[in-house]
Amino acid sequence: MSEKIVQLNEEVIKGQIKELVRGSVEETLNELLEKEAESLTQAARYERSEARQGYRSGHYDRNLTTTSGDVTLHVPRLKGVSFETAIIERYRRRERSVEEALIEMYLAGVSVRRVEDITEALWGSKVSPATISELNKKAYVHIEDWRNRPLQGGKYPYVYVDGIYLRRNWGGEYENVAVLVAIAVNEDGFREVLGAAEGMKEDKASWVSFFQWLRGRGLDGVKLIVGDKCMGMLEAVGEVFPDAKYQRCTVHFYRNVFSVVPKSKVKIVAKMLKAIHAQESKKASREKAKTVVSELRAMKLKEAAKKVEDGIEETLTYCDFPSEHWTRIRTNNVIERLNREIRRRTRVVGIFPDGNSALMLVCARLRHVAGTQWGCKKYMNMKHLEAALDDASIAG
């Protein structure tokens, strides 16, 4: 006897299961809404009760996108009592996270078509181009509001600056664009992202414009600016913050010296350089630097010796400040860590569609980090600086 062969249409079955799950989710959510309404009114529908706190007045429909697909919620209308449902609030939070993801995708240069495909794969329904366009407008408004917010941290004694280079499309050609970033430690000892702006290139004009923009928003009380050596930035510091001192990042200084040192000798030279900044006073560091210069010349590393001799003084400015702060103010590490996170995010984009989208994504990431423990955890005890402000070398 021949056996009967049953053929199953896998796609049909998947579709039926998906619809079954979606329907179950919709039914469950609506039942929960009814239970919430009963709890608020302290009575079931049509129930006569002296304990009743409010009355029903029909329903209104609310569409929600869930991981199981689109569902329609029949939200009870109530009279005499406010109905703030926890069900919808939970989905509002989920919707916000979805919105943030869509915004980040768009800012990263993902095409509208690709965003549609991704949303369909994740949530079972496409986000329309009109919705993406609205999210884009909303993103730019929110980020611009944050970027131009007044700085309300009081005084900012320590400011760290750097430039991040990203690739963008300009009239069909690809070029580098600099995004200038500044963070600070405020008078209470907390780190704060001051802002970011497109600088085109790290020249004096870009830095002057950047610093003036920060001052206009409330940057005040700057005692020290830490950053890599950039002549445009140094000239801008002297013009916009004449009372502030400059500290060249020691890590960047080391790298500059290593650029003229054979790989086989980098480790020994690194130990020699670190020994300079391990001294307990500026005078001792200067003496150690002279010794290192002589040793480098003896090792036939004349170019390295010249770089140390010419550049060491601007790496010792931190010695004019409280010793308790030295390890935190002689390098740009506090901003470098942020930059690594930004580069990790922007690397997947490769080339941005324009400079503004690059700036917006950098700002979106900075705003996110600022809202985490990074910005809520005390970074320095500023009482040490307060006690030292009587010293004319700092107070200026």
Model-found features: residue ranges?
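Acidic/histidine-rich catalytic cores and adjacent linkers
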Residues: 2-4, 35-38, 42, 107, ...
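DNA-recognition alpha helix
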Residues: 113-124
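Short, conserved DNA-binding cores of transcription-related domains
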Residues: 2-89, 167
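RNase H-like nuclease fold core
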Residues: 74-79, 87-92, 125-126, 131-226, ...
